[in-house]
Amino acid sequence: MGFEMKPEKEVLELISSKNQCKSNPNSVKKKNKNKNKKMMMTWRRKKIDSPADGITAVRRLFNTCKEVFSNGGPGVIPSEDKIQQLREILDDMKPEDVGLTPTMPYFRPNSGVEARSSPPITYLHLHQCDQFSIGIFCLPPSGVIPLHNHPGMTVFSKLLFGTMHIKSYDWVVDAPMRDSKTRLAKLKVDSTFTAPCNASILYPEDGGNMHRFTAITACAVLDVLGPPYCNPEGRHCTYFLEFPLDKLSSEDDDVLSSEEEKEGYAWLQERDDNPEDHTNVVGALYRGPKVED
């Protein structure tokens, strides 16, 4: 943590005005010398603790996203170097970098009668363009973002604080579909994560493209999507129901024969109901550091 200090111009003006004092030259000169030395030392320590280039963490994230996704598009995965570049930025992100604390109203659990229902999840929109989007999901305890997909996207997720369970799947590409809305998927992640932890990455066809978030404690997740959802371009957010392999399988199905093979697989069925019927996400104004000019 750095020391609070006035802007450099004010500090230098203050030093200059003090040096112009002429009364009691010996004592005043010594006193001013000590004060000036202390102020300049404080200023130097403040500069050391600040970003070397004077750019905030969220601005650095924005600039990096512009570079990483500059030639992106549906199904286009950034190069490994660019993925690592963005991952390193996200790994260092902290709640205070985006103006969040766990005591904010977004993270309060339901109480009374409301405690029986899933608490609302707040989405803070930071930026969106054709190439990428940046946003934050704020989840109270027991908050759930249902199982959903990310068509043609590369997605970076950074848990800023709290504890969250993540379950994710990828499609089994060569397996026949159960019906027009039901496909076989293989489990990718089924684990609980606690901040601080590194960012996770999913890809168009790998890394757990369909995932569900469940808040164990109050938590916040910073999401970067490249490219973002876009209904006119066919990148819809689709929600799924999850069924054990035996639940929808028949005797004629020979997708997976042995019990060992069946472990870690499930049927994912596209939901027909309105997403608003099973999601409780509300938008709120982002009040953290500026993302762009």
From Swiss-Prot:
Enzyme class, spelled out: oxidoreductase
Necessary cofactors: Fe(2+)
UniProt GO molecular function: cysteine dioxygenase activity; iron ion binding
Localization of this protein: Nucleus; Cytoplasm
Cofactor note: Binds 1 Fe(2+) cation per subunit.
Coiled-coil stretches noted in the UniProt entry, renumbered to this chain: none
Catalytic activity: L-cysteine + O2 = 3-sulfino-L-alanine + H(+)
pH relationship of activity: Optimum pH is 8.5 with CGGAIISDFIPPPR peptide as substrate.
The keyword Metal-binding belongs to this UniProt entry's keyword annotation: yes
Entry EC number(s): 1.13.11.20
Chain intervals with Basic and acidic residues compositional bias: 269-279
Cellular component terms (Gene Ontology): cytosol; nucleus
Record keyword Methyltransferase present: no
GO-annotated biological processes: anaerobic respiration; cellular response to hypoxia; detection of hypoxia; peptidyl-cysteine oxidation; response to hypoxia
Induction: Up-regulated by hypoxia. Up-regulated by the ERF-VII transcription factor RAP2-12 during hypoxia.
Pfam families in UniProt: PCO_ADO (PF07847)
Major location category of this protein: nucleus
Keywords from the UniProt entry: Cytoplasm, Iron, Metal-binding, Nucleus, Oxidoreductase
The organism's place on the tree of life at top rank: Eukaryota
Functional description taken from the UniProt entry: Catalyzes the oxidation of N-terminal cysteine residues (N-Cys), thus preparing the protein for N-end rule pathway-mediated proteasomal degradation, upstream of the N-end rule enzymes ATE1, ATE2 and PRT6. Controls the preparation of the group VII ethylene response factor (ERF-VII) proteins for degradation via the 26S proteasome N-end rule pathway. Acts as an oxygen sensor that controls the stability of ERF-VII proteins, which are stabilized in flooding-induced hypoxia, and regulate transcriptional adaptation to these adverse conditions.
Family designation: Belongs to the cysteine dioxygenase family.
Protein name from the UniProt record: Plant cysteine oxidase 1
Organism whose genome encodes this protein: Arabidopsis thaliana (Mouse-ear cress)
